[in-house]
């Protein structure tokens, strides 16, 4: 089998080289129709998109950026230690940010830099329903309308931390929003454990296998007294409650004010109310009694957003909570349903069925929400944007073309329910495209730009009711984007996946319907 004219740059990462070898050995060229062999040369170029941010970081080694990156990361750890010394009641350790290298801080999005440019950034601490202290930041601009829509953003799991999403929070603030970012329990600067008797209710923040001692497992049911049915989830995945319940706690805090100070809800496990801790800490100045930027928030125009496990939470909470008007789920939008274990959900997801073999967590997320509360699933009523990429967490090439609709099933379900939705699949993108990993974890260069653009446009339509939002969504720039072409291995200016269909189904402001099932090709 001959593949002529195929070359990788000398700086290509080892993963891309191994992927290319796999393709040359096992794939044969052909038309990329579902079930047929993909073009190995095209797939090799697509895989190179995966490593663009890492290549960009390597290109910055001769500049001052690495030193500023190191300084920002060290400063984060310094502030972390100072905060813990000043407030011994807090207990974030151990989590991923206990280790310096797993929480790199982008110097371009620091609070001091934001404030110097005219931005407002208010660090906040508040008590969750499990009694843990959660850490976050409220963002806005000094100039702008007196009342603005609000967005609450939830991190992803495992190595998620608030600073990885500050780029998006600042972009939304510049666009006219008030934004709350925060670390879910067990991540970043938030406590790992709750207050007795709910120490384990929201612990471990989605970390695989540690879910065995969380409330979704049989062990957790015994420890925490949860009422989940025996056998309902084996506890293989992490604990989803820090994301589902934590985002609602964060929303409650975001909508608090001096005349309605924040108080946590009763814990899910034991029904214990930890309001006394919140009131005590607020009185002592070690927690905020209410949102410090409350005057700016228009509580009738609220959106939820999140990445990874945070996107799962936003998908559920945005339907379950009547205060929410729009949802953005960055890898990945899910459909509410009966609770299911995280690891089992990935292992059985249709998108991960390759050549008739079920391979867990290879290419995408399951369609149904995992790790969700044991409650009746809410109906689909709130408009939702779904964004994902061609790949998930590893640059595994496609030997055969996948089902092109397999990453838009959730969006299609919204359409069947008569609710606006979109599914945007980034060409060559992966799970890290929606977080700021500063290139230490590879991702595409344009992924964050595309996520920022679509997130802003989606909220502009449903929260700000911008007169230009319909035109932005129905005539997007991403089919012919010069910046995408400039960094793309093949010079392709079209940022939409050719493996999977991207779609948009919305009602325009004038009441007419716009539906396009292939945004890469475009629709009239």
Where do the language-model regions lie?
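Short glycine-enriched nucleophile-adjacent loop
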Residues: 255, 311-321
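Short beta-to-alpha linker loops that shape the active-site pocket of alpha/beta-hydrolase fold enzymes
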Residues: 129, 183-187, 333, 429
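Alpha/beta-hydrolase-fold serine-hydrolase catalytic core, especially in secreted/extracellular enzymes
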Residues: 34-71, 427-431, 436-524
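Conserved alpha/beta-hydrolase "nucleophile elbow" surrounding the catalytic nucleophile
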Residues: 306-308
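Alpha/beta-hydrolase active-site loop
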Residues: 200-299
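N-terminal cap/lid segment of alpha/beta-hydrolase-fold proteins
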Residues: 81-146
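The feature captures the conserved acid-bearing segment of alpha/beta-hydrolase catalytic domains
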Residues: 325-431
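Short substrate-entry loop that stabilizes the transition state in hydrolases
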Residues: 144-148, 153-192, 336, 394-396
């Amino acid at each position: 089998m001959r593949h002529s004219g195929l070359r990788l740059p000398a700086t290509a990462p080892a993963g891309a080289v191994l992927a290319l070898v796999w393709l040359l050995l096992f794939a044969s060229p052909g038309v990329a129709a579902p079930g047929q062999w993909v073009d190995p040369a095209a797939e090799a170029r697509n895989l190179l998109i995966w490593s663009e941010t890492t290549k960009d970081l390597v290109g910055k080694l001769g500049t001052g950026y690495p030193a500023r990156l190191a300084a920002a990361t060290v400063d984060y750890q310094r502030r972390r230690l100072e905060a813990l010394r000043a407030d011994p009641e807090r207990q974030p350790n151990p989590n991923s940010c206990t280790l310096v290298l797993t929480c790199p801080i982008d110097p371009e999005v620091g609070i001091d830099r934001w404030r110097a440019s005219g931005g407002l950034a208010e660090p906040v601490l508040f008590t969750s329903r499990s009694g843990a202290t959660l850490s976050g930041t409220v963002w806005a601009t000094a100039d702008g309308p007196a009342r603005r829509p609000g967005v609450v953003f939830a991190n992803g799991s495992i190595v998620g931390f608030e600073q990885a999403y500050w780029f998006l929070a600042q972009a939304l603030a510049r666009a006219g929003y008030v934004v709350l970012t925060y670390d879910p329990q067990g991540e970043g600067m938030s406590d790992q454990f709750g207050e007795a008797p709910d120490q384990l209710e929201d612990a471990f923040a989605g970390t695989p296998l540690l879910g065995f001692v969380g409330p979704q497992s049989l062990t957790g049911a015994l420890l925490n007294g949860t009422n989940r049915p025996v056998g309902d989830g084996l506890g293989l995945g992490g604990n989803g409650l820090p994301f589902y319940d934590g985002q609602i706690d964060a929303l409650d805090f975001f909508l608090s004010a001096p005349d309605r100070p924040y108080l946590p809800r009763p814990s899910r496990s034991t029904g214990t109310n930890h309001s006394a801790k919140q009131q005590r800490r607020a009185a002592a100045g070690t927690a905020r009694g209410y949102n410090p930027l409350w005057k700016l928030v228009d509580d009738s125009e609220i959106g939820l957003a999140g990445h990874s496990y945070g996107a799962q939470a936003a998908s559920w909470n945005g339907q379950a909570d009547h205060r929410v008007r729009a949802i953005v789920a960055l890898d990945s939008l899910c459909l509410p349903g009966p609770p299911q274990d995280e690891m089992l959900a990935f292992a059985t997801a249709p998108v991960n069925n390759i050549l008739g073999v079920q391979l867990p967590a290879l290419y995408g997320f399951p369609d149904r929400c995992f790790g969700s509360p044991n409650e009746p699933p809410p109906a689909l009523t709130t408009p939702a944007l779904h964004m994902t990429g061609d790949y998930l967490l590893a640059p595994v090439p496609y030997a055969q073309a996948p089902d092109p609709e397999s990453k838009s099933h959730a969006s299609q379900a919204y359409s069947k329910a008569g609710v606006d939705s979109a599914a945007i699949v980034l060409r060559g993108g992966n799970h890290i495209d929606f977080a700021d990993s500063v290139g230490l974890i590879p991702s595409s260069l344009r992924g964050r730009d595309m996520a920022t653009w679509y997130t802003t446009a989606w909220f502009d339509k449903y929260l700000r009711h911008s007169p230009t939002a319909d035109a932005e969504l129905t005539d997007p720039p991403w089919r012919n984007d010069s910046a995408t072409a400039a960094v793309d291995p093949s010079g392709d200016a079209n940022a939409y996946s050719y493996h999977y269909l991207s779609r948009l189904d919305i009602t325009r402001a004038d009441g007419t319907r716009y539906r396009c099932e292939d945004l890469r090709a475009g629709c009239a």
